[in-house]
Amino acid sequence: MTIRNYNYHMTHFVISAPDIRHLPRDEGIEVAFAGRSNAGKSSALNTLTNQKGLARTSKTPGRTQLINLFEVVDGVRLVDLPGYGYAEVPEEMKLKWQRALGEYLQKRNCLKGLVVLMDIRHPLKDLDQQMITWAVAVGTPVLLLLTKADKLASGACKAQLNLVREAIIPFMGDIQVEAFSSLKKIGVDKLREKLDTWFSEIPPEVMAEEFDGEGE
């Protein structure tokens, strides 16, 4: 497989949807970003794409209530899933979000990778583990980003990385763990490399259409 380097700075917003029934057709390739409401998911997307306002950041956790799609190039999409685990959201809303998350992860055939973001100081909460379990159950590879790595000293950061890497062994899945910081740009290259690898598995017919378009 040839790994293609994508220009994530060209990423643009496509649509917001309450559930998978309102998403575009299940084709091409998608990589989803999931995480607790305060895990730094929007900041990570903005850092990845070098666009400050691509994914909305908020001082109020739980603002991402919809599935937000962003297109890198034709047929290649990043998906910002609803943040989970925010205590002040009504229980009915929490359950609705969790249903939407589970349905997307288990039924969206074009999903080729899942990025789960967790605060490095508080990793692998119950809902984080649920995301991993859903992904592993359908054979979706996972990249765990331990965010806000700048909050810890180097030694403590490495210790947390090792702890999480050991803790995920029982999941028996294709799971990679990396430290990440939007502020200090830690782990951004690792994220891009993983996305490039996943997106290079794009169906040949989509890739052919894309290159035909470039030649016009």
Curated annotation (Swiss-Prot):
Cofactor entry: Mg(2+)
GO biological process: division septum assembly
Occurrences of domain EngB-type G (ranges): 27-201
PROSITE patterns given in the database record: G_ENGB
Residues the record lists as binding GTP: 35-42, 62-66, 80-83, 147-150, 180-182
InterPro entries: G_ENGB_dom, GTP-bd, GTP-bd_ribosome_bio_YsxC, P-loop_NTPase
Cell division found in the keyword field: yes
Binding site for Mg(2+): S42, T64
Alphabetized GO MF terms: GTP binding; metal ion binding
Keywords, in A-Z order: Cell cycle, Cell division, GTP-binding, Magnesium, Metal-binding, Nucleotide-binding, Septation
GO cellular component: cytosol
Protein function: Necessary for normal cell division and for the maintenance of normal septation.
Family classification: Belongs to the TRAFAC class TrmE-Era-EngA-EngB-Septin-like GTPase superfamily. EngB GTPase family.
Name assigned to this protein: Probable GTP-binding protein EngB
Lineage: Bacteria, Pseudomonadati, Pseudomonadota, Gammaproteobacteria, Enterobacterales
